[in-house]
């Protein structure tokens, strides 16, 4: 369910209609792929990802295929949670598994807002299953809180062909129906 192909080296050339390419940002330690996330947009509400300095910090998030959730600092997560709550028009319910902070009752008529990851260089529109997960009787925002490990997780990357090009120093996302590959 959480799988998506990642490509490196000669196979990292991810091209085609809808391909989104953003610059990698060299940071220490060098074992992670850092990019600059400028904001998340919930419908038309742009929520900037500013750091302690009040500006967007270079290389402020890593692309992580090993972690399911996208993890964000509490102050940024709280703003996204508020925007999603205001746009959803549904009552919150507790997460039956205590994994998520924002959940709504699972319902076919539940209207969830569109969410876009605004990276420096391009925007990645998330599908419903990239931003929300349904567990049992609840549908929850698939973002978590962390002050120390800020990551764009595998749920957000699901059904994207992801290519890391170390020569061009970029990462590309191409919408791809992995379940039909």
PLM feature segments, named:
Residues 1-181:
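C-terminal catalytic lobe of pepsin-like aspartyl proteases
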